[in-house]
From Swiss-Prot:
Biological function: May be involved in the intracellular transport of sterols or other lipids. May bind cholesterol or other sterols.
Protein name as it appears in the record: StAR-related lipid transfer protein 5
Phylogenetic placement of the source organism: Eukaryota, Metazoa, Chordata, Craniata, Vertebrata
Organism from which the protein derives: Homo sapiens (Human)
GO MF terms held by the record: cholesterol binding; cholesterol transfer activity
Keyword Transmembrane helix: no
Length: 213
């Protein structure tokens, strides 16, 4: 992928993510519990929903980021039940790459294994926040593979945010914005994401404790 185009695209995605983070209008809460709130609103990118999760994770910002960051051989594959593989298709800079993520079957196998090819940008902000910003791209080195339905991530990612005065806690805001593709009943998709995101936070908390205590 052309590096200049990749840089331009990824910065636009990061800006869109900041807009999602700042925009408080139009979100409808669909699941709450154990300190985690999941809400949604209709996507303007595809005929589906944009989901937003927020919760406090007990761990320093760097510990939490270490568990969620997009990295080959990283911890995410070890604890996230919705990730079975992560590989770098093209490394563009030390903070920008094209990746392929594979996911298992889900919802009692109503959702078959998926894979996603994304342009991913990691950004650090002056207040200490670290963000991961991603969107789907096509790449000649990663055509569709047998055994996987190719899904499409629209602008999505997460913000690991420091909590002033509480260095051992991190506010994690996540945005899931996924077209799972294939012929899935909408009610299956609508029930999958809120439940899956709630488990994501619970499993992440266990991972931070397991890998960083």
């Amino acid at each position: 992928m052309d590096p200049a185009l990749a840089a331009q695209m990824s910065e636009a995605v990061a800006e869109k993510m900041l807009q999602y983070r700042r925009d408080t209008a139009g979100w409808k809460i669909c699941r709450e519990g154990n300190g985690v709130s999941v809400s949604w609103r209709p996507s303007v990118e595809f005929p589906g929903n944009l989901y937003r999760g927020e919760g406090i994770v007990y761990g320093t910002l760097e510990e939490v980021w270490d568990c969620v960051k997009p990295a080959v051989g990283g911890l995410r594959v070890k604890w996230d039940e919705n990730v079975t593989g992560f590989e770098i298709i093209q490394s563009i800079t030390d903070t920008l790459c094209v990746s392929r993520t594979s996911t298992p079957s889900a919802a009692m196998k109503l959702i078959s294994p998926r894979d996603f090819v994304d342009l991913v940008l990691v950004k650090r902000y002056e207040d200490g926040t670290i963000s991961s910003n991603a969107t789907h791209v096509e790449h000649p080195l990663c055509p569709p593979k047998p055994g996987f339905v190719r899904g499409f991530n629209h602008p999505c990612g997460c913000f690991c945010e420091p909590l002033p005065g509480e260095p051992t806690k991190t506010n994690l805001v996540t945005f899931f914005h996924t077209d799972l593709s294939g012929y899935l009943p909408q009610n299956v998709v609508d029930s999958f994401f809120p439940r899956s995101m709630t488990r994501f936070y619970a499993n992440l908390q266990k991972a931070v404790k397991q890998f960083h205590e």
